Amino acid sequence: MSLEMTEYDKLQSANLNLLLEAGVALSGEKDIDVLMELIITTSMKLTNADGGTLYRVVDGQQLEFSILHNRSLQVRMGGKGSRQDLPPPLPLFTQGAGNYSHVACHAVLTGKTINIADAYLNEDFDFSGTRASDAQLGYRSQSLLAVPLKNHESDIIGVLQLINAQDPQTGQVVAFSPAASQYAEALASQAAVALTNRMLMDQMAALFESFI
């Protein structure tokens, strides 16, 4: 039996190494903006996504855009970059009911990963805002993966949303594979714990300074 690694095996090995390296980096990072940058860039590498957005839950009522990257459009907002042009927060509830029509909100409210092959063919969610933005930018948001950030206390503190997985050989936009979804979920779990710990440390530091 040949022990030679196939291209698939090499990719899986590289992704596992990337996950391990990310886990170490996430646990040691003290700057929350750098932490969010690391989450987005690593998740895009793991899934070969063209774009990614990290949302954070605010007061249990809305989702705040914390960072947004898109390689094709050369967009980098939030994190260590400018927050000026970030979209407004998304309400988790409208008129007392859960905002299940928006993918990111649905992921928070249900705690489940959502994998959509083509947003333009999907009728389960409201993509009118996405389509309007695409038309303005000359882009097509096709495949989409939304992963809730659930920490060690099972609290959902945000959502990692990735768009347009690309075939590494052809560059064509494809659906996110089951393996890509698993890698994103593994990273999201690490990221949620790291973000929770960092926010707690920042809150403790602010409280300490208030007593000085």
Model segments located where?
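Interdomain signal-transducing alpha-helices
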Residues: S43, A107, G111, I116, ...
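A short, aliphatic-rich beta-strand micro-motif
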Residues: Q142-N151, G158
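Signal-transducing coupling segments at domain and membrane junctions
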Residues: Y100-C105, K112-T113, A117-S143, Q166-A175
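Short regulatory alpha-helical segment in sensory/regulatory domains of signaling proteins that mediates
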Residues: G23-G28, I39-N48, L54-V58, Q95, ...
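GAF sensory/regulatory domain recognition
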Residues: T41, T53-G98, L121-N122, L160
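Signal-transmission linkers at sensory-effector interfaces
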Residues: M1-L38, M44-L46, I67-H69, A186, ...
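Short, glycine/acidic-rich hinge or "gate" loops at secondary-structure transitions
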Residues: Y55-V58, I116, E123-F125, L200-E209
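Regulatory loop-to-helix N-cap segments in sensory/regulatory domains
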Residues: L3-L11, A135, R140, D155-I157, ...
